[in-house]
Amino acid sequence: YDTGYPPEGEGVCTDVIWYAIDNAGYNFKAMIDKDIELNKEEYKLIDIIDPNIDFRRVSTQYTFLKRYVESYSTDYEDIMEFNPGDILTFDDADHIAMVSDKRNAKGIPYLIQNRDETQEEKEEDRLEITDMEITGHFRFTYNNDIKKLIKSI
């Protein structure tokens, strides 16, 4: 896509994340693009920088989150650690989703995600039945590192 952003109604799992962060008042694409520009060596899977797609790759978002935000427990049974808006990565850099404010009868949160074309709802009770391993649990909050990065844009 010329602007990097997919048309309304289209998207992959990473689009849920940048869309939510953008709607919280941050330009996630600009922050990622700037961090790649300043620290390309940290983004191991990027050979050639392409601002039209880099921010939409799970591996890129995973690297950015590891660098800038707090990490939490990856054990979904530790339900008190999971807050609405938390970001989860699966199988290192294969999938990414957001924790919903909705929970099932056991208290386990739903996920908001673009999983595949057959998916009927974006908000699903799938956390405890997924065959993917949670490899990252992040909470995007405004902190000094984010503040410094935003000022450099």
Predicted regions and their residues:
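N-terminal capping segments
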Residues: 1-66
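Residue-identity detector for threonine
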Residues: 3, 14, 60-63, 74, ...
